[in-house]
């Protein structure tokens, strides 16, 4: 079991450091979004194919437009994100390349803490998660506050952003001083969709929760956390997708063992 680096300024949030997000207690602040750092993988995978270009992160480094939009289709409905590259250029470029190659398609919104954040960005497919585990990008300066509806990368420490994103469900200005740099914003009507994401699991998850998602993919979440919402697709608005490389073969996920 790996240990995840905590992202908190502990005195601010009042939690001890640990391997995974601490369970929030009524009246206390929730832990800041953190990202998995484990390189371990497994054989479970969702029943769909992925763009094999995602297995080579070093090749996906196109510069994003100054502004662009991404349409999300989810199990709760649709919303649109507008990205402003000047807010966080490195993060905006990474997000652009991930969306172009459909990284977020079929991914679950695996962490939703009421009144705090909705977090996603662990691939439905273990081989893809494995490929991006060490594909870190450098931090951007924080030029925008973590306001309600703003999108920001989760991290596991300085210069460790990879693929995980969170949407602020309220104004979380306390995250600004910790280096969380927003790069986009959900349209106002779309926030009604985001606020419907299933949130009753909260942070009541195992210490190795993200590790299990990384190793087993969506198969694990569907078996153990079946009420989670997911992203059916995330696509660039008004821009054709790049020519897809041969898709990975479908693999049947192993039967989940009872807890």
Predicted regions, residues:
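Bacterial N-terminal signal peptides
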Residues: 7-16
